[in-house]
């Protein structure tokens, strides 16, 4: 039994040791991040901290001298001569006061600069991570929880840890100097300070940990309130919410979740408040007991009035400094817990990096693209999406992928774009295995026009230039792409031409229709001038006339490109040189439009259903 108890104690000690090692690791990581962002300002912040650390002692001692010398001068036969000494002390105190306040102003400026630089640095790190991590992370609910904790709760915490650590060091030096002063009065005075402050500090530490655990456990609920807030406030949901009269339901749901969050949060704070009140009673008893002892010693002549003033102020300042130190230590502890989320997020491994290879994407392609026995399932799913799929896309040809939703059409595009790698099989580009070709080279040679393409609230020129944002090829190339996409005339008619901001974000910006945005997306794809053009339901949101006009443009401007087309509209699919029909995770049929109709199989069945719908 004793052996088990000893083992339990050892285990508890081991886990406690591991926890503190983790806190220390988070603490070091905070300094590493802040120093990387603000080297110069981190070093220079030491100077105001040093000034602030010696000022409490200097101020308290100067007040003692001023009081004693003033009392002496009042009873001196040569009052003016005695007052000169008082005046000198007042001037020194004034200089210290001014120096302290100038130091505080300088320190506030340093902190503001460091905060701005650090936030820019952290945002850059987060943006680099979110745009480079493997796209499979976006299929994982745990990623969103981690992102929420890192972005909403942790992004500013490393800076707080560093700022509060500097403040703790500053206040500790100041407290040490006051403690030396108080020990000249009595050895027990310092114990009075501990009795007045330690219980309150322990309360803050305990409830910092409780609050952290509560925030962690309620991350998903908090995320849901943010999502509902987006539904209620963003323009893209506004019409549907009004048409379905969803607002009352969503507002009730938001209030319910917020009430649960608020009550859970306040429950912790109410309990903390109760413990803090008890700790404050203890502090008041200790401090005012010490005041009584000091006053008694002054009455019986042991202390001067100046010493009385000095010790009273020193005790008050000492208690205040102790409370600040414990408060900052509690905050450092809490903030360091959150820093771990930021570290884990920023350290998410990036798999889709360029391999150590010199192999570039063949340019120009001669043979084309071959999917050879490709099988794949998403990392977050147990269901296979593709099984032994074989597809041949000749260079310069347009190939269409047809099938029901979820049949794997878009997955093939993701595999070709190296967002994912096949579980088995190969994707060959002119005979080269895609996995051996540099990722950057693959992305340079593929462009896309998607169903849910982005509407960038930038200028018309920038919207097109984003096709190849890393290279500035001049306005002529932008205009050329716009002309090919037949959007140049519209852009020229806008108030500021190519410098007009698109969308609804500003008062002087201009919104486009869906068809016009689609042409803008086409211009962006043409500006990139890649060999392979992916078109994933590019006309799904267009009416028949707009679709016809857009595909007339497609036929003309993409005639020399290798095009991979996904569409449910057979009027669109007919433009393809060859068609693959996907069903049950594999290729069910393949051939030209005419061949597939003659087979009278799955393709013909889907085509006839759609044709009947249009006839009716």
Where in this protein do the model-derived segments appear?
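An intracellular "coupling" helix at the cytosolic face of ABC transporter transmembrane type-1 domains
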Residues: 36, 151-161, 213, 217-220, ...
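Transmembrane helix-loop-helix hairpins at lipid-water interfaces of multipass membrane proteins
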Residues: 42-106, 180-211, 285-292, 296-305, ...
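Membrane-integrated ABC transporters
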Residues: 1-56, 75-89, 107-111, 128, ...
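Short intracellular "coupling" helices and adjacent cytoplasmic loop segments at the cytosolic face
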Residues: 7-16, 125-156, 218-252, 344-357, ...
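Juxtamembrane helix-loop junctions of ABC transporter transmembrane domains
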Residues: 16, 59-63, 97-139, 143, ...
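Conserved catalytic Walker-motif region of ABC-type ATPase nucleotide-binding domains
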Residues: 130, 254, 371-373
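Cytosolic ends of transmembrane helices, especially the final helix of ABC transmembrane type-1 domains
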Residues: 217, 246, 290, 311-347
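ABC-type nucleotide-binding domain
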Residues: 359-616
